[in-house]
Amino acid sequence: MSLLIPPPTRFVGLHGHTGFSVFDGLGYPSDHIDFVLENGMDAWALTDHGNGSGLAHAHKHAEKIRKSGRKYRQIYGCEFYFVPSLTQWKDDYEQAKIDRAAAKAKALKEDTDAGHVVENEEETKTIQIGKDEWKRRYHLVITAQNRVGLGNLFTLIKRAYMDGFYRYPRIDWKLLKQYSEGLNVSTACLGGIYSNRIMRGNALKK
């Protein structure tokens, strides 16, 4: 499938999703790479949500393309789920469970999900003043500059599942600072932390 108009000469997409981003992308990485080449671009960043499952597929297809003599650069990345502090998030989450359980007990209402707190994916992408901060999962796009960065990218993905997993894997400022070498970090989409703050009127808040 080609674009209706020619792309800018040096345009490179730095935020892309495939079928490995559940409910947010379609197709295999190879489909996207072929589309990029077909439309005159010679590089593309794969940044699936919270995982690197498609990166090996992209790498294999990129190698095949280069061996055929065509110029192409695969940029390896991930769109992380992000909270400012995993420690604070865990504390807030546990307190929310306690508060919810207490409210249910007080109302003498039996429910199969008693003691559990359910997150809604759409809620994390919308701007709601006064929303409980622990429910937010900001989005953060990170791409690797080099081999060191690629190693740190994989480490962050692993730590997101080990240290910050509840329904979705998360990282925080502390982890990002610890494994920042060789990485490019961008603000992602409207689900990004700075986009949210701009929309909520407190963009300068640290």
Locate each region found by the language model.
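Phosphodiester-processing cores and adjacent nucleic acid-binding clamps
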Residues: 1-206
